[in-house]
């Protein structure tokens, strides 16, 4: 049976192509907000980090009514680091709206999310967004998107997909660029016409595959999934079949049931085939679990999630300043928080190590792990992390394989030489180079994942902030040999204390400082970057010796350059293999793993 009064769609796109803004506009024009209601920009991005970075990390569910048809919309992350989210939520929908920037065209992560949709044989609608941009080239972008579909072996149904031209910012969609540009009606009607209605059998035993987990401090864990067969109702007795151990079956009762309307979850008594529902009251529900009838407990196969490619060690902070700024500082606190993250993030892996105070955390990329670190920091955790390392595989002959990436770089023509030189040093191979479009050339590289660790900051410096770097995981390939990372050494504090202008003034002649006057430092803490290859120890807490013949005002004449304040991402990129990042709610500090200078030298030459 088909539910003709329901359509389930996911909005997929490369990061920053405007899909969250498009969903905002669909919500506004469907009439879910009151006329006098103030609506924030990118209302679907609810997490603080999402708003600050302008990216979507967690998939979001919403529902709108259009001409008596309920359209359930899922806004998905555009960054491949959060691809585990995309892969799961696509199981809930029958079609996707692929949003493509009218200037940039299809990008690496467009390819990533589209490939996942095609593997599931979903219907596709292409929305060419930002057609109001002066440099927009919609006709060429249509051709590029069709080429991408052919490259990904799309079927006839998907190659025959409709194209809608839109400006989410201006609030219009049209099927013809020369036609009327009034509202989003053409997009709504295309969705209803081209996306198939969800199908299922209401007479069969209940099946709901949990695709996402939400958490609410009042009701606890909330499982979100689509009703594939049967009917779900409040107070119904069900069986939860565990995703990883199908023999493990737990009897539960549905206490609360919700559907999505606009930005809200609305309580309902029951839900039919094809509905996307949120279920609360089941304490240890996990992603991939199936909720079934007591009589016919049959699990739905769970989508295999791509494996992690990089790892970091998360450990207890043991620096001299440990425990002064964090609320949660013990090994048990860190362990509980990391294992709790596994409940909602299927792409993450956490392993206990031989050292009780350290945990190996593996994820899909530096951004994936940096978002976890930032969330923990904001929640009051204090801990330390190591430099990111890639996860190697070995083939049947014992040959070492490493994760590879496709890097697509848009850069002003004058910087192409510097980019090619740097990426070649990092074992990158130039696959394709497209002539400048609007002054920008496009370079495509195949490069080991470890070749990109720590490169983004260097890239922004080399391109004076004008370059755009996008990457996509491209499987495993033969190990490419050693890569030399940072060429500059570290400036290391020699003793504990507070930094003083006089000490910093002498230190800044040796390199770039990361600290200003009046900051707490300790021996072994990295306080800057040298201009040379070796590390330099320096006393930044040293004050000027007092004499009877001091020139008036000579101390005031000491001019300090402003310190370079590193963001979390920059600090993660900067640290070397013998360094750690100390994370607290108030500060991010870089330090040597071995703080004692004598022991550090001994370890280096042993």
Language-model segments: what does each one mean?
Residues 260, 265-268, 401, 447, ...:
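Long insertion/accessory domains within large nucleic-acid-processing enzymes
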Residues 319-342, 557, 561:
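A short, contiguous, amphipathic alpha-helix enriched in charged residues
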Residues 39-42, 152-164, 198-209, 238, ...:
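Interdomain boundary/hinge elements
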Residues 231, 282-284, 363-369, 412-416, ...:
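Helix N-cap motif at beta-to-alpha junctions
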Residues 1-100, 104, 144, 213-216:
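P-loop NTPase switch module centered on the Walker A-proximal segment
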Residues 123, 133-193:
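Canonical P-loop GTPase G-domain recognition
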């Amino acid at each position: 049976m088909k539910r003709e009064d329901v359509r389930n769609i996911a909005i997929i796109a490369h990061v920053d192509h405007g899909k969250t803004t498009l969903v905002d506009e669909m919500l506004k024009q469907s009439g879910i907000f009151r006329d006098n209601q103030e609506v924030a920009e990118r209302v679907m991005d609810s997490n603080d980090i999402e708003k600050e970075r302008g990216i979507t990390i967690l998939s979001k569910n919403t529902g709108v009514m259009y001409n008596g048809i309920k359209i359930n919309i899922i806004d998905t992350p555009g960054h491949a680091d959060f691809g585990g989210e995309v892969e799961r939520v696509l199981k809930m929908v029958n079609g996707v709206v692929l949003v493509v920037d009218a200037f940039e065209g299809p990008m690496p992560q467009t390819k990533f999310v589209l490939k996942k949709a095609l593997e599931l044989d979903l219907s596709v609608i292409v929305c060419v967004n930002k057609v109001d941009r002066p440099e927009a080239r919609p006709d060429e972008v249509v051709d590029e998107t069709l080429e991408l579909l052919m490259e990904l072996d799309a079927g006839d149904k998907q190659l025959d997909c409709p194209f809608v031209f839109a400006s989410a910012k201006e609030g219009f969609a049209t099927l013809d660029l020369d036609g009327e540009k009034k509202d989003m009606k053409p997009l709504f009607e295309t969705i209803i016409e081209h996306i198939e209605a969800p199908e299922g059998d209401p007479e069969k035993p209940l099946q709901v595959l949990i695709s996402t987990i939400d958490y609410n401090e009042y009701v606890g864990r909330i499982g979100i999934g689509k009703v594939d067969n049967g009917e779900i109702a409040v107070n119904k007795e069900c069986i939860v079949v565990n995703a990883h151990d199908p023999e493990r079956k737990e009897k539960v009762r549905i206490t609360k049931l919700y559907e999505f309307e606009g930005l809200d979850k609305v309580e309902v008594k029951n839900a039919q085939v094809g509905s996307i529902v949120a279920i609360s009251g089941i304490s240890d529900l996990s992603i991939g679990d199936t909720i079934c009838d007591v009589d016919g407990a049959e699990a739905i196969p769970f989508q295999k999630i791509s494996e992690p490619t990089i790892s970091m060690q998360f450990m207890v902070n043991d620096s001299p300043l440990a425990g002064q700024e964090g609320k949660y500082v013990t090994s048990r606190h860190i362990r509980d928080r990391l294992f709790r993250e596994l409940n909602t993030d299927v792409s993450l892996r956490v392993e206990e190590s031989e050292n009780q105070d350290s945990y190996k955390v593996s994820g899909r990329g530096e951004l994936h792990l940096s978002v976890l670190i930032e969330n923990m920091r904001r929640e009051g955790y204090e801990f330390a992390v190591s430099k990111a390392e890639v996860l190697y595989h070995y083939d049947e002959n014992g040959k070492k394989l490493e994760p590879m990436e496709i890097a697509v770089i848009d850069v002003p023509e004058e910087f192409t030489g510097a980019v090619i030189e740097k990426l070649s040093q990092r074992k990158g191979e130039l696959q394709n180079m497209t002539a400048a479009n609007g002054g920008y050339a496009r370079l495509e590289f195949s490069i080991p994942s470890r070749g990109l660790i720590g490169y983004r900051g260097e890239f922004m410096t080399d391109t004076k902030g004008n370059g755009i770097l996008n990457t996509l995981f491209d499987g495993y390939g033969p190990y490419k040999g050693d890569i030399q990372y940072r060429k500059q050494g570290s400036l290391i504090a020699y003793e504990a204390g507070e930094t003083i202008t006089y000490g910093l003034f002498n230190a800044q002649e040796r390199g770039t400082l990361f600290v200003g006057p009046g900051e707490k430092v300790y021996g072994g803490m990295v306080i800057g970057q040298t201009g040379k290859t070796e590390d330099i120890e320096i006393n930044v807490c040293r004050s000027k010796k007092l004499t009877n013949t001091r020139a008036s005002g000579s101390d005031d004449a000491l001019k300090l350059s402003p310190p370079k304040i590193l963001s979390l991402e920059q600090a993660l990129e900067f640290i070397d293999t013998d360094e750690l990042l100390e994370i607290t709610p108030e500060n991010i500090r870089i330090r040597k793993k071995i703080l004692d200078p004598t022991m550090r030298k001994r370890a280096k030459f042993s």
